[in-house]
Amino acid sequence: MKPSNFNGIKKYFGRKKPSIQEIVREPTAGGIVFRRNKQGELEFLLYQDARERWTIPKGHIESGETAQAAAIREVGEESGLKDVESICWLGKVNFRYRRVDKLVLISQQNYLIRPRTSGDEIKKEEWMTDIRWFSMQDALDKVEYEDIGKLILLAMKRIRQEGF
């Protein structure tokens, strides 16, 4: 005897996704933002998105804008930090997702960024669940995207090399 919802389950899983009609390329930029707290300990800035995943400030590169300028702008817009500087390029992360009948290809350029002053307070955007500073280990424990974890480790290496 079939369960009463068998036909509904069969109908749901039997659906076919629409075929991909278009490939969309979206260049983006992000920042691994770091600082030294009052005790001199290194911290990294992460925010929690609507899906409750911790990640870094990032967003689309606008027309005529460099990836580095976009990373600095996005960090400011998403964190409230007004005076930041880009230290160096850390690398590119590529990922993709499907949006109905479109395949979206993201190419994200990432930069090591730090606040120039210690007085700026971070602010949470309404679409964020949370935003805060984490120790390196806590940041690595929080991020769910493996590539972002690798970027944090690379950032740590560069920070030590440069003596920040």
How should each PLM-predicted stretch be described?
Residues 2-37:
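Acidic, metal-coordinating catalytic segment for phosphate/diphosphate chemistry
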Residues 37-43, 100-103:
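Short, solvent-exposed loop/turn segments that connect beta-strands within catalytic domains
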Residues 45-48:
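Short, acidic/hydrophobic/Gly-rich beta-strand patch recurrent on exposed beta strands
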Residues 51-54, 139:
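A short, flexible beta-alpha/helix-coil linker loop
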Residues 55-59:
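A short gly/proline-enriched turn/hairpin at secondary-structure junctions
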Residues 61-150:
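Unchanged
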Residues 151-158:
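A small-molecule sensor/coupling module
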